[in-house]
Amino acid sequence: GTRRRGGPDRFAELRQWTPKTRLGRMVLDGEIMTYQQALATGLPIREVEIIDALIPNLEEDVLAVNMIQRMTDSGRRVRFNVLCVVGNHDGYVGLAICKGKEVASTIQKAITKAKLDLIPVMRGNGSWESGQGPGKSVPIKVTGRSGSTRVTLMPAPAGKGLVIGDTGRRVLNKAGVTDVWSSTAGQTRTTINFAQATFNALKQLNRTRIGDQDKLKLHITRGEVGA
C-alpha cells in the first residue's frame, strides 16, 4: 500500500542527521534548497536524508513481495524479493528491487534504494486530441524494456486517465503522469518486468533530444511543477 512521509517526525530525524558527504552538508546548511539544485551540482546523491529533506512529500508503494525458497544442505532457505516505487505525484519517481531474509527490513531497503534512484519525469501535452496548454501526459511516444517485456507509452488527452495495466498505473501515478495510452508486448504478467519497463520508458524520455521549439509546442516540463 501507499504511505506518505512528512510531518514533524521527519524534521526531528533530520536534526539528528550528521551528513557524511559534501552534498549532504550543503543541504543541511541550507545552501541547497531543491532537488533540481542538488542535481545541478553534479555531486552524487548517496544519503537518503538528502531526498527526505528536499522532497518531503514522497510516497512509497510496495508493488510486489515475492518469496523465494531454496533447498540447501542445511535445509530450506527463504528469502524475499521486494519491488518498491516512490514518487511525489509531481515529476519525480524512483523504482528499486531488493532481496533479503526479512520482509520489513527488505521493504525499507527497497524504499531507500528507490529514493536514491529518483529521476525527474518529462511531462507534456503531446496528444493531437488535446487542446492547447499544459498537460500531464508523456510528450512523445516512448518505449521501455525489461527482460522480454516491452511497454510503450503514448500521449493521451487530459482527462483520459492511465490506460495501462495496474502495475504501470501505480508507477505513473507516483510520477505525476495522469493521462496515457499504452501498448505492451512480451511477458506482461510479471509485475517486476512490467514496472521496470514502465520506469525505463520514463528514463528513456530523459535521454530523448527534443528541440526548443517542440518543448514549447508540447508544453514540456521536467520534474516538479507544483500544480
Where are these regions (language model features)?
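Ribosome-associated RNA-binding proteins
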Residues: 1-227
